[in-house]
Amino acid sequence: KEGYPDGQNGKKIPCAINDNISKTXEQA
């Protein structure tokens, strides 16, 4: 959960920032 590729922007974002984000790894 360090960071997964975000399909929306095609760049890696930290998934562990928020408990909600860590589940999908996507930025809202």
UniProtKB/Swiss-Prot annotation:
<feature type="region of interest" description="Disordered">
    <location>
        <begin position="1"/>
        <end position="28"/>
    </location>
</feature>
<keyword id="KW-0964">Secreted</keyword>
<comment type="function">
    <text>Causes symptoms of mild intoxication and transient paralysis in insects (A.domestica).</text>
</comment>
<dbReference type="GO" id="GO:0005576">
    <property type="term" value="C:extracellular region"/>
</dbReference>
<dbReference type="GO" id="GO:0090729">
    <property type="term" value="F:toxin activity"/>
</dbReference>
<feature type="compositionally biased region" description="Polar residues">
    <location>
        <begin position="19"/>
        <end position="28"/>
    </location>
</feature>
<keyword id="KW-0800">Toxin</keyword>
<protein>
    <recommendedName>
        <fullName>Venom protein</fullName>
    </recommendedName>
</protein>
